[in-house]
């Protein structure tokens, strides 16, 4: 994959600089210091990506080859847009030939070659609008959706797993045969019914934790490769 033109450090801050914010709480100051000095954050700034999450997708793809040959891609929970940046590049999506659709309830700045829907994915109209935006069956459905955290691990896990399940049902209903599904999960166990559903409909199902995911994070990704097609029994989308 060709790397985008180096954009430079747009923050005006020297890389590796300390954070001096007297009014911030200690925990917030610690997080901000870690974020600014994170090598993946620095690389994202230098290579023109909107977020460090770009390297999670690139690392997963380096091992599992899910982007190669993709003609249409749908990005769920897309803001601020680093995965969509990569998707537009690999599909050759342009303003005249849109092949990438991104959705998030958060506002997301324009990206060339990407149709952006500022909408909750659980909205009943969202699935059809996404498929219409890319003009047919996608080869990859990827989801970085996560529910807002409450601080209660079990609650956070269940809420994010629900989003993962809805995304999985969507992928099964819209993917082209041979397509792939990638979704964020949290450590704490993937529901058996979801794993069974994916194993029934895909040729390979694995959990992956890319190096770009912070070591202390409970974040993981569920990858289902090689969609078997819709002649297989499967569930339907439920909000």
UniProtKB/Swiss-Prot annotation:
Q: Where does S-adenosyl-L-methionine bind?
A: 81, 83, 104, 120, 144
Task performed by this protein = Specifically methylates the uridine in position 2552 of 23S rRNA at the 2'-O position of the ribose in the fully assembled 50S ribosomal subunit.
Q: Which InterPro entries match?
A: RNA_methyltr_RlmE (IPR050082), RNA_MeTrfase_FtsJ_dom (IPR002877), rRNA-MeTfrase_E (IPR015507), SAM-dependent_MTases_sf (IPR029063)
Question: PANTHER family, from UniProt?
Answer: RIBOSOMAL RNA METHYLTRANSFERASE, RRNA METHYLTRANSFERASE 2, MITOCHONDRIAL
Q: Which GO terms describe its cellular component?
A: cytoplasm
Give the source species. Answer: Rhizobium rhizogenes (strain K84 / ATCC BAA-868)
Q: Which gene encodes it?
A: rlmE
This chain's protein is named Ribosomal RNA large subunit methyltransferase E
Q: Which reaction does it catalyse?
A: uridine(2552) in 23S rRNA + S-adenosyl-L-methionine = 2'-O-methyluridine(2552) in 23S rRNA + S-adenosyl-L-homocysteine + H(+)
EC nos: 2.1.1.166
Family in the record = Belongs to the class I-like SAM-binding methyltransferase superfamily. RNA methyltransferase RlmE family.
């Amino acid at each position: 994959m060709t790397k985008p033109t180096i954009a430079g450090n747009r923050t005006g801050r020297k890389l590796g600089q300390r954070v001096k914010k007297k009014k911030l709480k200690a925990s917030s100051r610690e997080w901000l210091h870690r974020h600014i000095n994170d090598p993946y954050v620095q690389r994202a700034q230098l290579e023109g990506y909107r977020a460090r999450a770009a390297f999670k997708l690139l690392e997963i793809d380096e091992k599992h080859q899910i982007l190669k040959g993709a003609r249409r891609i749908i990005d769920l929970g897309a803001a601020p847009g680093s995965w969509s940046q990569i998707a537009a590049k690999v599909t050759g999506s342009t303003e005249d030939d849109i092949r990438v659709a991104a959705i998030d309830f958060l506002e997301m700045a324009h990206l060339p070659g990407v149709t952006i829907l500022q909408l909750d994915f659980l909205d009943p109209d969202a699935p059809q609008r996404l498929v219409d935006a890319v003009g047919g069956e996608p080869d990859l459905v990827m989801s970085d959706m996560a529910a807002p955290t409450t601080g209660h691990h079990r609650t956070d896990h269940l809420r994010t797993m629900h989003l993962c399940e809805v995304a999985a049902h969507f992928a099964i209903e819209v993917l082209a045969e041979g397509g792939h599904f990638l979704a964020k999960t949290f450590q704490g166990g993937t529901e058996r019914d979801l794993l069974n559903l994916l194993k029934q409909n895909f040729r390979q199902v694995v959990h992956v934790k890319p190096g770009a995911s912070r070591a202390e994070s409970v974040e993981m990704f569920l990858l289902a490769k090689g969609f078997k097609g819709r002649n297989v029994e499967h569930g339907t989308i439920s909000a």
